[in-house]
Amino acid sequence: MFTINVETRKEQGKGASRRLRTANKFPAIIYGGNEAAVAIELDHDSVMNLQSKPGFYDEVLTLVVDGKETKVKVQAVQRHPFKPKLHHIDFVRA
């Protein structure tokens, strides 16, 4: 079981996403179920360490958003074309 602490995003858009990536974070979104979509930000290094482990893309993950646990699965991942960097992850509620 994987547990990741995340923060809700205060700003959205191209410039805000670039500032996140410069600060070694990246944007993501949680959607699905009966709740509204939530824009979040994740720490790049911690997710890179977790995603290299078996089961990260197959198992149900736990995201802690502002103290509230949400069960999700990875739906889509966007990566940098040639650097080992993540650009964005879509999570769908499990």
UniProtKB/Swiss-Prot annotation:
InterPro entries attached to this UniProt entry: Rbsml_bL25/Gln-tRNA_synth_N (IPR020056), Ribosomal_bL25/Gln-tRNA_synth (IPR011035), Ribosomal_bL25_short (IPR020055), Ribosomal_L25_dom (IPR029751), Ribosomal_uL5_bac-type (IPR020930)
Gene name of the encoded protein: rplY
Keyword list, A-Z: Ribonucleoprotein, Ribosomal protein, RNA-binding, rRNA-binding
Recorded superkingdom: Bacteria
CDD domains: Ribosomal_L25_TL5_CTC
Full protein name: Large ribosomal subunit protein bL25
Complex formation: Part of the 50S ribosomal subunit; part of the 5S rRNA/L5/L18/L25 subcomplex. Contacts the 5S rRNA. Binds to the 5S rRNA independently of L5 and L18.
SUPFAM superfamilies: Ribosomal protein L25-like (SSF50715)
Gene3D superfamilies on file: Ribosomal Protein L25, Chain P
Biological classification of the source: Bacteria, Pseudomonadati, Pseudomonadota, Gammaproteobacteria, Enterobacterales
Entry GO MF terms: 5S rRNA binding; structural constituent of ribosome
Pfam families linked: Ribosomal_L25p
